[in-house]
Design a protein with these regions (language model features):
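N-terminal structured subdomain of primase-like DNA metabolism proteins
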Residues: 1-90
């Protein structure tokens, strides 16, 4: 029998803070290459066409956009709980 540790319960404030987390430093911590463009936009060569600015990202070619949590879930494939852990730290 395998015991799983319970998933943490995240408060509304923790989720709000994670949504607004600046993406560029988080992506740099994960060693993702970023290319700075005009007006504070960054491109990720590993994801052609994806644009990051502040705590938001958009990928026009795929009709996707979102906040920091969405990036970790939709683009990097993490679960919500793993995304929250990555964004909020240990």
């Amino acid at each position: 029998m395998t015991l799983h540790s319970p998933q943490p319960r995240w408060s509304r404030e923790q989720i709000r803070t994670a949504r607004l987390a600046p993406l560029v430093p988080l992506l740099q911590q994960r060693a993702l290459q970023l290319s700075e463009q005009a007006a504070g936009n960054f491109l990720l060569p590993a994801y052609p066409g994806l644009i990051v600015k502040d705590s938001y990202w958009r990928w026009p070619e795929r009709n996707l956009a979102g906040n920091a949590i969405d990036f970790f879930v939709q683009i990097l494939g993490l679960s919500f709980h793993d995304a929250m852990r990555q964004i909020t730290g240990p």
